[in-house]
Amino acid sequence: MQNDILLKAKELFLNHGFKSVTMDDLAKELGISKKTIYQFYSDKTALVSAVTDHLFEHISTGISCICDGEKNPIEEMFAIKEFSRSALQDEKSSPHYQLQRYYPKIFAVLVRKQFQTMQNCTQDNIKRGIEMGIYRSDIDLEFITRMFFAGFNAVRHEELFPSDHFNKSKLFNLHLAYHLRGIATPKGLEIIDKITAKS
């Protein structure tokens, strides 16, 4: 039952936002009483924390599996983007913004964990890309890594890119293209063009 609650809460939070979904909504969706939910989660904050932890672990594991594969660094970045988009269900509402606004402590912990994971993954990706000649060798690794992470969070910022004006999926595509085309060599650009031509 606890896993059912967690998975349904994740679905509702991603579709409608962390603030918008109430414990009553969750209980109704599951066909159970709120008392049953409180047997596993002391309050909504505890549930939000559990959902964000679950999402983070799921996405981190998926990204690790992609990085352990045989893709070249550019293909790897496109695969990670698609996996993350799918795992977040295209962020149909603005869960990132609501989490930041209404659960700032949980958000701060999540951002720290995300940065550590993305920093390691991105730096390894760039190093391999340089070795293969598809990324420029004059890249400032620390700067580019942090800029990529900053951009990843910026495109999810509701005030900068409001959902009623910008398509989140398109924003992720634009952000990745901005990142890769800025660091790619002519050889790397050929790979990017081939991948984007298929999509």
Predicted segments with their positions:
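Helix-turn-helix
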Residues: 4, 8, 12-46, 50
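Hydrophobic alpha-helical connector segments
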Residues: 50, 64-91, 145-148
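Short, basic, alpha-helical segments at the C-terminal edge of helix-turn-helix-like DNA-binding modules
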Residues: 53-60
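Secondary-structure edge/capping motif, primarily at the C-terminal ends of alpha-helices
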Residues: 66, 95-99, 159-162
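All-alpha amphipathic helical-bundle segments outside canonical DNA-binding/catalytic cores
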Residues: 75, 113, 131-147, 165-170, ...
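Short secondary-structure transition hinges
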Residues: 89-124, 131-135, 143
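C-terminal peripheral helix-coil segments that are non-catalytic and often amphipathic
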Residues: 124-128, 132, 165-199
